[in-house]
Amino acid sequence: MSLKKRYREAIQPKLLKDLNFSNLHQVPKVVKVTVNRGLGEAAQNAKSLEASVEEIATITGQKPVVTRAKKAIAGFKIRQGMPIGVAVTLRGDRMYAFLERLINLALPRIRDFRGVSEKSFDGRGNYTLGVREQIIFPEISFDKIDAIRGMDITIVTTARNDEEGQALLREMGMPFRNN
């Protein structure tokens, strides 16, 4: 059963009861997932930018947008308009497919994985996690990568607070660390 179908048929009714909501539309849901990779070396190395665009597209199934510097910063040797990263926003079916792969395939492949931190909520029910290596995703072949690079994954929900957001992600199968 896909995550989207499981959310509609099992998770939504359970959260409605657990969080004492009177209306189904009050139940928190995932709005979007943002995958971002900052590339400091992209200013000097164009190949790293191309490799990152390809990797993020392979992982998410959607072509990422190249983010550019808004201002020149001499200390970082970047000028305005230089590429400094890649980002992609997933919604709908692609979002649910990505979340399912992240929770069930990618996170368990992290070395010494004991669960994700419960402290990474932002106060409004949104969750951000940093991934140190892109090779945890099964779509990325170890032979084809030129360097190990991480990424930030933000899960935006309609939850009003962290407790609701955590309840939603826990029901979806997010492996939280037992403190």
Swiss-Prot record:
What do the Gene Ontology cellular component annotations say? ribonucleoprotein complex; ribosome
Return the InterPro entries for the record. Answer: Ribosomal_uL5 (IPR002132), Ribosomal_uL5_bac-type (IPR020930), Ribosomal_uL5_C (IPR031309), Ribosomal_uL5_CS (IPR020929), Ribosomal_uL5_dom_sf (IPR022803), Ribosomal_uL5_N (IPR031310)
**Is Cytoplasm one of the keywords?**
no
Write out the entry's keywords from A to Z: Ribonucleoprotein, Ribosomal protein, RNA-binding, rRNA-binding, tRNA-binding
Q: Provide the leader sequence positions.
A: none
Q: Which SUPFAM superfamilies match?
A: RL5-like (SSF55282)
Q: Name one Pfam family in it.
A: Ribosomal_L5
PROSITE patterns xref list: RIBOSOMAL_L5
Task: Output the Gene Ontology terms for molecular function.
Answer: rRNA binding; structural constituent of ribosome; tRNA binding
Record's function text:
This is one of the proteins that bind and probably mediate the attachment of the 5S RNA into the large ribosomal subunit, where it forms part of the central protuberance. In the 70S ribosome it contacts protein S13 of the 30S subunit (bridge B1b), connecting the 2 subunits; this bridge is implicated in subunit movement. Contacts the P site tRNA; the 5S rRNA and some of its associated proteins might help stabilize positioning of ribosome-bound tRNAs.
What family does this belong to?
Belongs to the universal ribosomal protein uL5 family.
Q: Kindly provide the name given to this protein in its UniProt entry.
A: Large ribosomal subunit protein uL5
Gene name, per UniProt, is rplE
